[in-house]
Amino acid sequence: MKKIIGLDWDDVIGELIPTLIDKYNFLWDDTLDHKKIDDWDLTRFVKSNCGNKIYEYLDNKIYDSVEMVKDAKWGVDQLRKMGYRVVFITSNFVNTGNAKFEWLNRNGFNVEKNDFFECGDKTLIKYNLLLDDKYDTVLKSGKRGVLFTRSWNLKNKYPRRVSSWKEFIKNMKENRYGL
């Protein structure tokens, strides 16, 4: 039976936060740099009169302009060539529908419906290893998690962390995660 690699979508596959911040900057005439965001609470970084409205921009249309994380497609292809089953596990926002699934297929990831999961608690999905940018999610995964470095998780100390897809694939080829 193939080992399963679970991949988060937001900011591991697709550059969602940079796209969201670009939209916010345009609408609110601001110059917020997504690389300065060091926490999950975006309301701490946007103008006070924007506040929670920042999350309203996470609708299905935003995914039309989301770019791919560098080397994500290459990395997924490498995992598949190495014989792993790749599944995409993501939390979904209200009013986004199938936008992430459609984005994946539009960008050549060739994902079947049974390899795409939307859920808040990713530990409910069976995988041998999870690559995610959310510290709490990786922590819940125990030894099965790898933290994908982003500015918002730099303050979190976690021993299994990668800064790029190239580094993740190198570690996979060297069997650093014991699969």
Set out the residue ranges of the language-model regions.
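Active-site neighborhood of HAD-like aspartate-dependent phosphohydrolases
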Residues: M1-N52
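Generic beta-sheet signal
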Residues: W9, I89, F148-R150
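A structural signal for isolated positions on well-ordered beta-strands in alpha/beta enzyme cores
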Residues: R85-V87, L129, V146
